[in-house]
Amino acid sequence: MSLAGTLWAATATAAGPAVPLWLGRRTGRGKEFSARLGERSGIAGLARPPGRLVWLHGASVGETQSVVPLIQALRLARPDLALLLTSGTTTSARLLAARLGGAAAAPERSGALPENPGVLHQFLPLDRPAWVRRFLDHWRPDLALFVESELWPNLLAALGRRGTPAALVNARLSARSARRWALVPGLARQMLGGFRLVLAQSAGDAERLARLGARDPAVPGNLKWAAPPLPADADELARLRTLVAGRPVWAMASTHEGDEALAAAADRAARERFADLLTIIVPRHPERGAALAGTLPGAARRAAGQDPDAAIWLCDTLGELGLVCRLAPLVVMGKSFLPPGGGQNPLEPARLGAAVLFGPLMQNFADIALRLVAAGASRQLAGPEALAAEITSLLNDPPGLARMGAAAARLAAEEAGVLDRVMNALAPLLPAP
């Protein structure tokens, strides 16, 4: 183990006594489920199914959305395999329950997914050696698949000692993250070199991963292209379309702190041209809704059962971005204008035929953003000061909005084969029946 890895293990062990207090604070803020706190220390909340088990880890909502089509493909190709999905956020647990669990799922209490009994969810244990050992002793995975970029030194080292094969799927590494990892080159080599297979999102990601120690990363493409369109209730969509008929509509999606103020400022400026403008704000974390409502005087709030009959509609409910992206022909991506940025997934609205705008800070989705812009499906703005003018211009040009949406649909169709390429690459690592 590298010196940095040894220091990390010692620090994680020493920090153990302080973890319950930290978890308690997170629970109070809605970031942990009190009934499932044991999972964070490796105490399983469910029994391990018999037979072979493949474990997939996706840190948060974005990774969970990427991995759902992979889960479905694995279930179809290998119904004999049990699948364990871990994540680290309550929002991702709720999303997975909504996508795979059905009405009987209760993510606040259990990781069971009744509609897909061969798929289980658990929260990832914190990276303390004893807790990692407890987690692996219980689940005994035959293969571990890590999605995108969240890597934990003690966890990967424990898998290596047990001889459990691991792969890094849909891997991404921004230039900024690569520079940070280069400060601890031994630890980077230790973690990345332990993967039997690395599948990168883009050629740039593959190059950066290889420089830090990944062995021969392949580039099958980005699994985000394989994700199904975000769902929406058809009856509710029809009702809302009737309510907003005749109004120009735009949305800011997956907003983070500071984005809502930008949306409100753009709303005020664009309203000089469109007096009946509807601005929809969709916070990435719906639990922020109550606090946000206090900063948006007069806004209607979805979580309070209010319809979009005000200037601004705060859609602070989980799993309704698909509804909003079908309602608004123009969607602006949050987390792309203010530092540190990183962006949110522009494919979600683009796949649904919405024109998409984003700011200069799209480093977490750089390849997708470049391709959407090149295809004429999206536009990247230099900064927030350009937002109101661009919104006004596009809402004044419905045919132009439609052309951008059609371009996005064509590009998504061209990338439809990425899931097959990923499955073919994983096939040699899957455990024998």
What are these regions (language model features)?
Residues 73, 79, 86-89, 93-96, ...:
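Donor-nucleotide binding loops and adjacent catalytic segments primarily
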Residues 49-55, 241-250, 260-261, 276-278:
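Charged active-site motifs of nucleotide-sugar-dependent glycosyltransferases
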Residues 414-433:
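C-terminal alpha-helical cap of glycosyltransferases
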